[in-house]
């Protein structure tokens, strides 16, 4: 199987991709422009199926749909490593949490005490070659 065939065989919709998220999972969002907007929207639509899903991201300019759809944070709890203006407003309103960290220690945190169940990453499409 060539790379392009393998790539095409693995393509899926955001709605299908987020079906792997279960209640209580830790979900990682990438930061800044890597924010997985399509998966965030698809996950927010599963709100009533899920409880206590914890999400980590940082410097996401917003809006973040899992925050917007669940003001009481019964279904989704969003945590940010570093606040964008939008995330700071959400933290100030009690709708998100700030988790201070030092970037150089992040790999150590995951190696020694953090766990993740799902990671959502925005990537570019493959080259035609």
Where are these regions (language model features)?
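Conserved alpha/beta enzyme-core scaffold
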Residues: 1-129
């Amino acid at each position: 199987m060539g790379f392009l065939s393998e790539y095409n065989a693995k393509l899926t919709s955001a709605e299908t991709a987020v079906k792997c998220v279960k209640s209580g999972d830790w979900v990682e969002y990438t930061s800044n422009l890597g924010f997985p907007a399509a998966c965030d929207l698809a996950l927010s639509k599963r709100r009533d199926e899920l409880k206590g899903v914890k999400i980590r991201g940082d410097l996401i300019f917003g809006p973040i749909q899992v925050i917007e759809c669940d003001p009481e944070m019964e279904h989704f709890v969003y945590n940010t490593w570093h606040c964008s203006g939008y995330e700071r407003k959400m933290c100030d309103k009690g709708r998100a949490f700030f988790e201070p960290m030092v970037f150089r220690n992040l790999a150590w945190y995951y190696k020694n005490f953090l766990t993740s169940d799902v990671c959502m990453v925005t990537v570019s499409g493959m080259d035609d070659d």
